[in-house]
Amino acid sequence: MERWRDRLALVTGASGGIGAAVARALVQQGLKVVGCARTVGNIEELAAECKSAGYPGTLIPYRCDLSNEEDILSMFSAVRSQHSGVDICINNAGLARPDTLLSGSTSGWKEMFNVNVLALSICTREACQSMRERKVDDGHIININSMCGHRVPPPAETHFYSATKYAVTALTEGLRQELREARSHIRATCISPGVVETQFAFKLHDKDPEKAAATYEHMKCLKPEDVAEAVIYVLSTPPHVQIGDIQMRPTEQVT
């Protein structure tokens, strides 16, 4: 990880869960990290914790609504003017709404698509442009995907979400192919976790907290830090090593 020291990583959805764990891990490794979310109170608290802990890196909170392209473009412009540009882009932000295919709301589908697919694609495009215009040829795009991007689980309320995650799988491989055709050594990786104990289920089942809690009670789930360790592993591999996808799940998870 020494080659990444003092370089800049962007982490979307950094206000909690996997995003916060990834941001902390990168700061521990000596990186400058721009952590973005719609609200930055939690990121500001995490930045203060990292500073008081004496970690060698820095966490920079940035308020950004990823469903708004202008917000995303403004963020990349600010990063360019204040920090030169992005060397690592970790597309972590994602959401699920309980909108089924037979009776779901169009607004719920759009909300998932806008964040899980479009925002990820816009951030990827802007990050790659930032790298290439500065002749950064060892940058890395890491998409925090899901096991739902590789198989469709039975619960109907996860089916549209799964479709957005299948899109992430395709987008990551498509990006790898385009970068190779452009003779770039920027790398593209998916990390696809199974059940991770976060607030994800509580947001999906916000009207049924007992159902949400049950998601995490029947087995020992992954922790956000487990996914953060996978991110560090991917970044620590030599530049000639291309890791396309890491699928990880709790040992007790059925599918």
From Swiss-Prot:
GO terms of molecular function: 3-beta-hydroxysteroid 3-dehydrogenase (NADP+) activity; estradiol 17-beta-dehydrogenase [NAD(P)+] activity; nucleotide binding
InterPro entries linked to this entry: NAD(P)-bd_dom_sf, SDR_fam
Reactions catalysed according to its record: a 3beta-hydroxysteroid + NADP(+) = a 3-oxosteroid + NADPH + H(+); 17beta-estradiol + NAD(+) = estrone + NADH + H(+); 17beta-estradiol + NADP(+) = estrone + NADPH + H(+)
Compartment annotation: Secreted
GO CC annotations, alphabetized: extracellular region
Pathway: Steroid biosynthesis; estrogen biosynthesis
Protein's GO biological process: estrogen biosynthetic process
Record text on activity regulation: Inhibited by flavonoids including apigenin, luteolin, genistein, kaempferol and quercetin and also by carbenoxolone, zearalenone, glycyrrhetinic, curcumin and flufenamic acid.
List of catalytic residues: 161 (proton acceptor)
A UniProt-annotated Pfam family: adh_short
Binding site for substrate: 146, 161
Residues the entry annotates as binding NADP(+): 13-18, 38-39, 44, 65-66, 92, 161, 165, 196-199, 203
The protein's enzyme class: oxidoreductase
Signal sequence, renumbered to the chain: 1-25
Segments forming a coiled coil: none
Key words of the record: Lipid metabolism, NADP, Nucleotide-binding, Oxidoreductase, Secreted, Signal, Steroid metabolism
Major localization class: secreted
Keyword Calcium in annotation: no
Enzyme Commission numbers on file: 1.1.1.270, 1.1.1.62
PANTHER family referenced in this protein's UniProt entry, alphabetically: DEHYDROGENASE/REDUCTASE SDR FAMILY MEMBER 11, DEHYDROGENASE_REDUCTASE SDR FAMILY MEMBER 11
Function noted in UniProt: Catalyzes the conversion of the 17-keto group of estrone, 4- and 5-androstenes and 5-alpha-androstanes into their 17-beta-hydroxyl metabolites and the conversion of the 3-keto group of 3-, 3,17- and 3,20- diketosteroids into their 3-hydroxyl metabolites. Exhibits reductive 3-beta-hydroxysteroid dehydrogenase activity toward 5-beta-androstanes, 5-beta-pregnanes, 4-pregnenes and bile acids. May also reduce endogenous and exogenous alpha-dicarbonyl compounds and xenobiotic alicyclic ketones.
Family: Belongs to the short-chain dehydrogenases/reductases (SDR) family.
Official protein name in the record: Dehydrogenase/reductase SDR family member 11
Lineage of the species this protein comes from: Eukaryota, Metazoa, Chordata, Craniata, Vertebrata
Gene: DHRS11
